[in-house]
Each structure stands twice: as structure tokens, then as C-alpha cells.
Amino acid sequence: MDLTLLWVLLPLVTVAWGQYGDYGYSYHQYHDYSDDGWVNLNRQGFSYQCPHGQVVVAVRSIFNKKEGSDRQWNYACMPTPQSLGEPTECWWEEINRAGMEWYQTCSNNGLVAGFQSRYFESVLDREWQFYCCRYSKRCPYSCWLTTEYPGHYGEEMDMISYNYDYYMRGATTTFSAVERDRQWKFIMCRMTDYDCEFANV
């Protein structure tokens, strides 16, 4: 690579990823983007879990109308900051049915640490489950919804959380019966740095 180009790009990369510095860990990037890098093939089920003590911080997907109007998926995880502690329990949430819109957050104030999905040829759509982890008795606050991903049905999707102190707690999706595709809005929340008494927020 030309050294001039490297010196131009290096400060940009440093600024973009420097926001993760408070974690005290390096950012665990996506798997390889090649065909072998996706967690699933089209029309195939999958189960993806972050390593213990990490949560999902990025979601990438491409749509293929010829392959059952399905998507291939890729995720990136990052360790939670030491102030949050270790996860005290993890579980799979209830299934969100294929062919329907849905809204779900992790119960018990959990954070999203994985996804599980199965494809249904009959509706050209997937059912979804979140893998959630709870961190002691920490509670979410200052929650908000991201913009829609993808921006339009059928487009590539690339969501990265650049706010290091916000965590994914769930999502809401629309479903187009015409396009056989979904748009996602992810639910992002901050977490208290102390234990609280709320069972679920």
C-alpha cells in the first residue's frame, strides 16, 4: 500500500475506533466478508453467540431475492466494560414468528449477546430469537431506537454502534409482504453502574 495513502487513512481509523478505548479491549471485528464469512447460507438456519462477557455491537446483512428473498448475516461482538462486571445469567428469548412484524427486548434487563434464526420457505421469511445476558442487577435507561436498517427493503444492511456506553437490548421490525424483507430498528440503552431493584424495564 502506498505510504501516503496509509498516513491519510490512519488518523481516520484511529478516530473511528478510538471511541471503544474506554472498554480497555480491542474491537472484535466482523468475520471475513467472503462467502465463507457469513454465519449462514441463504435459506439456512443459524445460531450465533458472542463469546462469554461480550455483547453484539454490529450487524451486517445482504439480501438475495433469487435465493428465497433471504439474507445472509454477520455480527460483531465486543467485551463489556469492566465496570459492568460479568454476566450473571444468559438465556434464549421467546421466538418471534416468521411473516409478522414484531417488537422485543431482552427480559430481566438483559443485553443482546446473540441471534438465532430459522428460515421458512412457505412464507419466504425467518423466525428470530435473541440470546440475552443479564449483568447482576444493572438496569437500562436513556433508551432509544436506531434509524431503520436497511434504509429500504432489499438493500445491504450495516449497523455499527459507535456509542460505547449504549448497548443493544432488542429490536423492532417491519415486514413487507411484497418484498419479503424486513427493516430493523435496534433498541439501544445505557446501563446503570450500580444495582437497582427493577425486575424488567
From Swiss-Prot:
InterPro entries: Dermatopontin. Sulfated on tyrosine residue(s). Pfam families: DERM (PF14704). Expressed in skeletal muscle, heart, pancreas, skin and cultured fibroblasts. Residues 70-186 are annotated as: 3 X 6 AA tandem repeats of D-R-[EQ]-W-[NQK]-[FY]. Disulfide bonds join C50-C77, C90-C132, C106-C133, C139-C196, C143-C189. GO terms for cellular component: extracellular region. The keyword Amino-acid biosynthesis does not apply. The keyword Disulfide bond applies. Its main location: secreted. Residues 26-135 are annotated as: 2 X 53-55 AA tandem repeats. Keywords: Cell adhesion, Disulfide bond, Extracellular matrix, Pyrrolidone carboxylic acid, Repeat, Secreted, Signal, Sulfation. Sequence repeats lie at residues 26-79, 70-75, 80-135, 125-130, 181-186. Residues 1-18 form the signal peptide. One of its GO terms (biological process) is cell adhesion. It is found in: Secreted, Extracellular space, Extracellular matrix. The modification Pyrrolidone carboxylic acid is found at Q19. The modification Sulfotyrosine is found at Y23, Y162, Y164, Y166, Y167, Y194. Seems to mediate adhesion by cell surface integrin binding. May serve as a communication link between the dermal fibroblast cell surface and its extracellular matrix environment. Enhances TGFB1 activity. Inhibits cell proliferation. Accelerates collagen fibril formation, and stabilizes collagen fibrils against low-temperature dissociation. Belongs to the dermatopontin family. Interacts with TGFB1, DCN and collagen. This is Dermatopontin. It comes from Bos taurus (Bovine). The lineage of its organism: Eukaryota, Metazoa, Chordata, Craniata, Vertebrata. The gene is DPT.
